[in-house]
Amino acid sequence: MKNISPHLSIYKFPITAISSITNRASGMYITLIGLSSSFLCFTNENTKNKFYNFYYNLNDYQKTFLNSLILYPFGYHFSGGLRHLIWDSFPHLLTNSKVATSSKFLFVVSIIPTLLLEEKIKNKI
């Protein structure tokens, strides 16, 4: 049987689609973190101590990497929410080229809230 359309690898995946998928994935990730954290609150002390000991036995670089891995989706989702508020207020910004540019910008700008949260955690611990 002959293929009707060419293989999907020839198509360029648009940054706007990647941004949309990442926004949905970060929302699911945040939900998972929330559920995991609440589950941890209801476990016995031995389980909690294992998690705490694991974290506190990491060196500073490992803690920073782990914190960033956990916090980046929060920063991304927050920044994406701000972007949608801006679009709601200024609909003329919703052109294809501006949406693509803002999607690229969003991936970079999300680092700022991640670093701010990371610094807050470092100061608390």
Role assignments for model-derived ranges:
Residues 1-125:
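Membrane-embedded alpha-helical bundles that constitute the cytochrome b-like, heme-associated redox core
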